[in-house]
Amino acid sequence: MSSDLGKKVREIREAEGLGRQAFCDLINVPKQTLINVETGRSSPSGKLLAEVSKCFSKYTLWLMTDQADESCGQISPEIEKARQTLKQTGTDTD
């Protein structure tokens, strides 16, 4: 489970287009802690998960349950990446 959460944290960071240091600055954790979590060397702490959820609240449901509900603003990194691709190609519907 912890490696799954670490992978999810990494997916969120990448979907937001952030490098590790920028992400760490936002969630107030040391870079080495993030590296250890993302690579599965350590489990994410409750504090880290809370900070990720606070800073990137649109991913909270997905982070904890593997589900997304766009109707209430809860998405997955996959949805965010698709949105970014649509914006870049000019095919978004907004």
Which residue ranges define each predicted feature?
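K/E-rich alpha-helical interaction surfaces of small helical-bundle regulatory domains
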Residues: 22-24, 58-67
